[in-house]
Each structure stands twice: as structure tokens, then as C-alpha cells.
């Protein structure tokens, strides 16, 4: 598979070059020259296939010729030691993406990426320096995924005071080859700093650089896997391959035959890498009817879907902090594959306030006993609004639950009481934070990187 920049389709690179470079030299994002199709037998079996088998079939065409079939098999089975179960809650599914080591959906992409990088760089002596901007969960997942990986050093930039105490310990509590910089600014500032550093010619001569944000195609592609797995189960209603029957909705069809309910997947969205991965799954042949892109008050893309005009803005802080993005990077990828008219047909945009988010967390727990984190609650409320507006009808609905609610206990527990805490998160709170504070200034960041390396 060849990849080209969203800003120049005339020059292409292979998967290894796209992944290890991260950002194209012209500042664009790498996209595949074509989005491959699942073989017919895979399309019809998504509802019953093992998660790692779906991962293998999804990723294989993107890395063909560079990662052998046996190596890819080893990578996906080492990366995906956890699943993405569908849980029936009221009239919809919760697609739980928080069963990885840092309890966030970012674990899927980060763990694959770390193992793929190790394979692609085998025999390489020069260290690789990875820069990553985070609004919360990406930093923790990347830090965990790359922790103690030989020959790779990671620097995580996060907005000071805008991540939770637990997120900060995941980002800045590991040490060894993981460093953290607390930036006096927003996530958008962190993202711009990373892009500027990756484009700096002097820095590139000094060290091998890459990024682990969703601007890196190798982190985005594996996220398509859970879309195909979830849509396959939701559309087909087949038993879970791990032995537990997938809960069914009222009126739900039991096989993928004409008349089965179309699938709507709601994606809590900020930087729009997650939704872009879903669009890849759709184009590959996953049985997805449409998406709902649910944002907080940082609603750049919902406004674009309404008007056709793309206007970035300064991000505003909310309780769903991982989605506090006013200039989503992956919008470039979306427009590389889809026109505005095409997006309008398959993506419903909706925004949700903090007040609505809090009410949703409390109401869903009171009615069902289910715990939602603030981001997943944005998705839940977004679906409620779209149903009231008659934009979603007769659909099997899945909410992508992107983080464990215990990661946001400061917001959630006052609304619903104590939350069961996974052992991995309880252990994380014992770490000490070790981060250097810097201003949102490119020369300061570059000087800091020179000092560290």
C-alpha cells in the first residue's frame, strides 16, 4: 500500500515511511492511496469472527509487503489482549472500548503502533524520538504502549491543569524512556507545538522524529478494527465468539439478512481521528449505515456539517476534556476521502453542553445502573437529541464508550456515587508526577528537546 499527503497527492511513500515519519514533509497527513475492501467471506463473518482475526484482516492490506502475515499475526495478538464488548443498556448498545491497560480507546492504536514500530525498526541503531500531544487519554495510552521499548523515546505534551489527576499520572508517572511536558495552554497549542517540531529542519537533522497522535496513520488504522467488530455483531446479532451471547435490542433481527436493522454508531469526537477510523471501516465494507459525531461545545465539525463552512476556533475547557479541540487535525483526512455532500449523507453532527452531560450521567445510572464517563455521556445525549429531531429511526444504535468512568471520578462520583475502579487504575494513582512546565512556545520546546537529547 502506498500513502500520500493530504496536501500533495503526487508523491507517495510506503507504510513504514508514513508511520515512522508521522507527518508529511509538507505538513499534511498521510492517507492510503485507496481504502481496500474486505473479502466477501470476511464481510459476511464479521459478527462471529474473533477480534484478533478481524484485526488481522483489517490491517493486512495496509501493511502488505512490509509486515509479513506471520509477523502481523504476532503483532495483533500481542497488542489486542483485550476486547471491545457490546453491552445492552436500555434501547442501545454500549461499545466498551476501555478494557485495555489505560482504560481508554486509545490503547487499541497505541499498542499496535508500539509493536509495529519495533518490527519496522528492527536492526536500526539510531534512536527514534516520538512526540505526542494529548488532551488526556492519548498520552497515557502512548506512554504505556511504548514504555521500556528499546531504542524509542517518547515526549508527551499535555495542557497544564486540563487533565485529570489520574490522566496526569498515566502521562507523567512512568519515567525511563517516557518524558512529560506540561504546556501552559490548550490541547490545540500542544498539537501545534508537536507539528512545528516535526517540521523543524534543524531538529530533524539532530534526531529521528515521529508522532504518536492520530495524525500518525499507524495509530488510526487499527482503530477501524473495533468498528467492524461492533457493526458486525450489531447488524448480525450472532453470539459473541468468546462464548457469551451478544445482548439484543427489542425488535432486533437475528441474522444479517434483508430487513435487519441498519447500524448507527455514535462517536464522541474531538480531534476526529476516531471517526476517521470508522469511515475507513465503512469504506472497507463494515455494515455501518451512518455515524453520529457527538462533540461538546467545541463543535467545529457539527457546524461544518450544517453549513459547509469549516471555521476553526479557540478550544473551550469542558468536563469532557479529551474532546476540547477547536481545530481537529483529522478533518484533513475526512475531506481527502469525502466531499461535504458525502459527509452529510453518512454523518450526523450534534453538540452537547456540560449541563446536559452531567444530567445524562446521573439519569442513565439512575435508570439502568450503568456508569458513563463524560465523553460517553456526550455520545448518549447526542443520540437522544438526534432521535428527538427524527434524524435517527429504526436503527441498531451503538455508543462508543471511549473511557472508563473511573478515569473521571472527580466529575462522575458526585453525580452517581462511588465507581468500581479497575486494578490498573488504582495502581496508577500511586505514581508520582514528574513533568516539566513550558510555555506554548516553539523555540522553548525545541530547546527543551535539545537539552533532553
What are the residue ranges of the model-derived segments?
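PLP-dependent amino-acid enzyme catalytic core
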Residues: 1-453
